[in-house]
Amino acid sequence: MLAVFAISGCYSLEPRSAGSVMRLVEESEKITATGYAVIAIQNSDDAAQRRLLAIRASKLDAYRALAEQVFGQRIDSQTTIGELVVNNDAFRSRVEGVIYGAELESIEPLNGDTYAVTLSLRKQVVKDLRLLYLRSLLRDAA
């Protein structure tokens, strides 16, 4: 009985504070994000241009993924219920922010028909971006 109490006494059920979440990001030197795009669905008749478009699309997808990590996502949802039955359930996700200082880590072809682009941001750039974002929120609220 005493052993169970000692073990359970070491674990906190309290949610993590914002400061502890920020420390998780600060412990690594950089954050990374990878974007993907399929070559075959790119809008061009020329194979070389489809590859270039896939690289461009996967780079934009990687930027979106970086923005999600830096600024988070806004989720809007709506559920319609009639006669205690769900008639419609819809949600939308939106990411908004400015990313600068991203470094290209790699451009890799995958399985012959997909490109993966990996970008990274140094932790100091992440701090700067978040600070600028918070300042813009305060300015807009005033």
Give the role of each language-model region.
Residues 1-10:
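Sec-dependent bacterial lipoprotein signal peptides
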Residues 10-142:
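Domain-level marker for long, solvent-exposed, non-transmembrane regions
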